[in-house]
Design a protein with these regions (language model features):
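An acidic, low-aromatic, low-complexity terminal/linker signal
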Residues: 1-145
Length: 145
């Protein structure tokens, strides 16, 4: 498998899934992704965090859905039926991130990731771990952990 080489020490590369929320491009390390599924109607959870859209149960597994547009203060999707859920697993917890489009996967060198400074990303509460320049656009790498 091609992805396994990225786990070996010394490759100095990672694969990043590019997606959009609003008009901006974002990325997440592919190693953190469990699967990508089309938008599902979710069940709201009373008294949950405002960024939690609700829950859904594909294949009898309950997954919390986080509305990434709310998290990053972006506009809602213009066509929710075309949206996607990026399902991740962090600390044995399955979480789906509601995004507007999924663009594709890019293999990048760690050296190509530009670290954000403190004016862009507060050290303790920022979700951006870096920025990658791809062709004519900037892709902001998000860390959901």
């Amino acid at each position: 498998m091609e992805t396994n080489i990225l786990m070996e020490s010394g490759t100095n590369e990672l694969e990043v899934l590019e997606f959009t929320v609003g008009n901006n491009h974002y990325g997440i390390n592919v190693a953190k992704i469990k699967e990508i599924v089309p938008f599902h109607v979710v069940t709201p959870v009373p008294n949950s965090h405002p960024n939690v859209e609700g829950i859904f149960m594909p294949r009898d597994m309950m997954i919390t859905v986080v509305d990434l547009a709310k998290v990053i203060n972006a506009k809602p999707s213009p066509d929710i039926k075309k949206d996607m859920f990026i399902i991740t697993n962090f600390n044995q917890l399955n979480v789906a991130f509601h995004v507007h489009t999924v663009i594709g996967i890019h293999r990048v060198s760690w050296a190509d990731i530009i670290k954000p400074d403190s004016t862009v990303n507060a050290e303790n509460d920022g979700v951006s771990t870096g920025v990658i320049k791809l062709e004519d656009k900037l892709v902001i790498i998000l860390d959901f952990e």
